[in-house]
Amino acid sequence: AKKIIGIDLGGTSVKFAILTQEGDIQEKWSIKTNILDEGSHIVPDIIASIKHHLELLNLSAEDFIGIGMGSPGAVDCFEGTVVGAYNLNWKTVQPIKKDIESALGIPFFIDNDANVAALGERWKGAGENQPDVVFMTLGTGVGGGIVAEGKLLHGAGGVAGELGHITVDFDRPFDCTCGKKGCLETVASATGIVNLTRRYADEYAGDATLKRLIDDGEEVTAKTVFDLAKDGDELALI
């Protein structure tokens, strides 16, 4: 039986899997995402990595029914293009489907990363193949995918499930990468944790380690805050 290649494209790494049509993973690997030069290395790196692994495993294009990929940004699943994936440095329209199909000769399908995560969770995870599933992704930002009556909702502009850009903070809104203010992901994500930590640090008068790091201009990430919270840091626990 023919197999499937799955690709999860992220700002830090690109994860690959070869799986059966039943969804069982047979091989998996990852490469670093090179976002230099406006992300122009990303697709060539993906193509080279797949070619390399097919050679290693003695497989060819004929062994696959298709490649499915989840990508950040606004994805046109019909044209197979991505635009506005800022964490990949992709500012202009990227013709991913055309490039990958012409290089590998395997049919290629792409959608927004949160949408394909929703489909995957419905198929093999907590969704248990129910017709209606809402899935949220939490990381650098907040994303989401919505399956209604067995079909993925794309909505106008392909952003139906992008829950991270609902405005929730009207009092003291932070700027969001999307250009608006007060979006959910400015307070409830890895980015949001850092935003709020900096705000609370300004108002906090104690001698917590986290306060010292911020005052000294050290880089503070969500992981820093979590690690210090585990150690009982007063500011991290606010």
Set out the residue ranges of the language-model regions.
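Short glycine-rich, Thr/Ser-proximal phosphate-binding strand/loop in the N-terminal lobe
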Residues: 3-48, 81-84
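Active-site glycine-centered loops adjacent to acidic/histidine catalytic or metal-binding residues
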Residues: 8, 113, 139
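Short, acidic, Ser/Thr-enriched surface-loop or helix-capping motifs
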Residues: 8, 20, 77, 147, ...
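A cytosolic small-molecule/anion-sensing beta-strand core signal
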Residues: 20-21, 71, 112, 148-149
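Adenine-nucleotide phosphate-binding core of ATP-dependent small-molecule kinases
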Residues: 35-62, 180, 184-187, 195-238
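Glycine-rich phosphate-binding loop and adjoining helix at the ATP-binding site
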Residues: 39-48, 63-67, 73-134
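Glycine-rich phosphate-binding loop of actin/hexokinase-like ATP-binding domains
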Residues: 128-187
